[in-house]
């Protein structure tokens, strides 16, 4: 009997959670064209808009206005802060021109060094390489992989 009394008293003391969400839409001026204004807004105003929009998102999604949905998407996934693009417009063409200039410079430097280099080394002529082959054959050097030293034509 005492148990039933405590059970009923316990049921009366239950508190149901009630959410007090903001039911009216944010002003269009606050969320309209948020993409262009977001970076220049003070952080307190940004936090205010974020908190108001997060309260609005707790309601059914159909109750949000279109500018609010766009603002929520931009704040969550837009190109600001860590999601800002690494390259600005025009940077890719600047980088491509720099890479092309570097390649042309390196090819030109290679050509100048080859022209100023003079004659080939004496070990690069065919006679030297054939004599090296004969010497290695007489010493039985590396019989499995071969010992051919001929590289020139």
Swiss-Prot record:
It is a single-pass membrane protein. Present with 3670 molecules/cell in log phase SD medium. Residues 21-88 are mitochondrial matrix. This is Cytochrome c oxidase subunit 5A, mitochondrial. One of its GO terms (cellular component) is mitochondrial intermembrane space. Gene3D superfamilies: Cytochrome c oxidase subunit IV. The keyword Oxidoreductase applies. It comes from the Eukaryota. It is found in: Mitochondrion inner membrane. The chain crosses the membrane at residues 89-111. InterPro entries: Cyt_c_oxidase_su4_fam, Cyt_c_oxidase_su4_sf. Component of the cytochrome c oxidase (complex IV, CIV), a multisubunit enzyme composed of 12 subunits. The complex is composed of a catalytic core of 3 subunits COX1, COX2 and COX3, encoded in the mitochondrial DNA, and 9 supernumerary subunits COX4, COX5A (or COX5B), COX6, COX7, COX8, COX9, COX12, COX13 and COX26, which are encoded in the nuclear genome. COX5A is the predominant subunit V during aerobic/normoxic growth, it gets replaced by COX5B under anaerobic/hypoxic conditions. Induction: By oxygen at the level of transcription through heme. Expression drops rapidly when the oxygen concentration falls below 0.5 uM O(2). Keywords: Membrane, Mitochondrion, Mitochondrion inner membrane, Oxidoreductase, Transit peptide, Transmembrane, Transmembrane helix. It comes from Saccharomyces cerevisiae (strain ATCC 204508 / S288c) (Baker's yeast). Belongs to the cytochrome c oxidase IV family.
